[in-house]
Curated annotation (Swiss-Prot):
Coiled-coil region(s): none
Phylogenetic classification of the source organism: Eukaryota, Fungi, Dikarya, Ascomycota, Taphrinomycotina
TM region positions: none
Organism: Schizosaccharomyces pombe (strain 972 / ATCC 24843)
Keyword Transport: no
Family: Belongs to the HIT family.
Intracellular or extracellular location(s): Cytoplasm; Nucleus
A single GO cellular-component term on record: P-body
A GO MF label: 5'-(N(7)-methyl 5'-triphosphoguanosine)-[mRNA] diphosphatase activity
Protein's UniProt name: m7GpppX diphosphatase
Catalytic activity line of the entry: a 5'-end (N(7)-methyl 5'-triphosphoguanosine)-ribonucleoside in mRNA + H2O = N(7)-methyl-GMP + a 5'-end diphospho-ribonucleoside in mRNA + 2 H(+)
Amino acid sequence: MEESSAAKIQLLKEFKFEKILKDDTKSKIITLYGKIRNEVALLLLEKTAFDLNTIKLDQLATFLQDTKLVENNDVFHWFLSTNFQDCSTLPSVKSTLIWPASETHVRKYSSQKKRMVCETPEMYLKVTKPFIETQRGPQIQWVENILTHKAEAERIVVEDPDPLNGFIVIPDLKWDRQTMSALNLMAIVHATDIASIRDLKYKHIPLLENIRNKVLTEVPKQFSVDKNQLKMFVHYLPSYYHLHVHILHVDHETGDGSAVGRAILLDDVIDRLRNSPDGLENVNITFNIGEQHFLFQPLTNMNA
């Protein structure tokens, strides 16, 4: 394990920066484009949240170092400081390396404007569904690894092994597992024939209700959170095409991740299925899409 870990850390050291893809000052994440061993790599650097269990608030003079005054006005004083850092207890940066990175990864993590699209059933069948088929199989091997316990097995929070109505809940790697207001989990279904909400039909209501009920029961047992502090939703378009449900703390600030035009509440999906027994393949769905997305041009052309 140590040798494997050292080899992965070495990859980070071999990253050769070429350009900045995105600088998000709100989320404090910068996305860098570069190469590792002549293959495209993306490196996401994120400022970590303060761990109030580690910082000794009664010893701030030790925590805040090299402090300088920026400005003061009446009762207000602004300072800049470096802070004491320790990788085990007080890391300051979380890094995510994607290597080798595909063109899909590059497009996804690039800075881009978004547009609203109303996708009709015809547009879905002619444009979106064929695209989704290209994003299955090897493109989501990492999902298969989780479902078969080949990877991240020690991170599983909840599991129901039933092949039809079962799922696995794991923490999203964006969450530090310490800041409860930033709680971020993901329920991945065992069923392999549901790529997105477009594949959902009336018969899938027991699956969705099972996710909702077990999450609301089990997650509060493991984390300091009440069930009415959890919000569950799906994305359309999703970031990968194997049905999964996002589970976040209600106070979580997620940018556009849980915003109108991207997220659909799980309870709303269940209600829509009750009212549309034939499924969600035959309804209009309006969502936002980035201009770098492979589907942007064909969908907007049909929407014109």
